[in-house]
Swiss-Prot record:
Domain of life: Bacteria
NCBIfam families assigned: S6
SUPFAM superfamilies, per database record: Ribosomal protein S6 (SSF54995)
BP GO annotations: translation
Any one GO molecular-function label of the UniProt entry: small ribosomal subunit rRNA binding
Function text: Binds together with bS18 to 16S ribosomal RNA.
InterPro entries noted in UniProt: Ribosomal_bS6, Ribosomal_bS6_sf, Ribosomal_S6_plastid/chlpt, Transl_elong_EF1B/ribsomal_bS6
Name of the protein in question: Small ribosomal subunit protein bS6
Swiss-Prot/TrEMBL keywords: Ribonucleoprotein, Ribosomal protein, RNA-binding, rRNA-binding
Organism: Chlorobium chlorochromatii (strain CaD3)
Any single GO CC term annotated in Swiss-Prot or TrEMBL for this entry: cytoplasm
Family statement: Belongs to the bacterial ribosomal protein bS6 family.
Length: 132
């Protein structure tokens, strides 16, 4: 019996492509995941960013993060297809384990708490600047 596990795929698409080509490449990645038996849970579009170092002689990349459920044997098939896509500069698929999910929940909880403190500090700083 094949049980589905939770995975995440972070992909860097060539940043030099037009928006339509980037959207087509993203749609292709999603199609590959669903055709191979995966179920996409969420897609986080991080946009164009400068890479830390040149990848395939490119310094700009379009970052996308996809969470999906799939059976373990399907991952090798997905990677086999993605490996030969020229538009993808890099990709990484990892399994989301319970400790990693728990750590994410803690980070989200603390970022909400810290975010509200930082927002309060910035509004009080704005009020002081307007009095001058």
């Amino acid at each position: 019996m094949k049980t589905n596990k939770l995975y995440e795929c972070t992909a860097i698409i060539d940043g030099g492509l037009q928006d339509e080509a980037v959207a087509a490449t993203l749609a292709m990645v999603q199609r590959v995941i669903t055709e191979k038996g995966g179920t996409i849970n969420s897609v986080l579009d991080l946009g164009r960013r400068k890479t830390a170092y040149p990848i395939k002689k490119k310094s700009m990349g379009y970052y996308v993060h996809i969470e999906f459920n799939a059976a373990a044997p399907v991952i090798a098939e997905i990677e086999r297809v993605l490996r030969y896509e020229e538009e993808l500069l890099r990709y990484l698929i990892i399994q989301l384990t319970t400790p990693l999910l728990e750590m994410r929940k803690r980070v989200e909880k603390y970022s909400v708490v810290l975010g509200s403190v930082e927002e309060g500090a910035s509004t009080s700083g704005d009020a002081e600047g307007s009095n001058e």
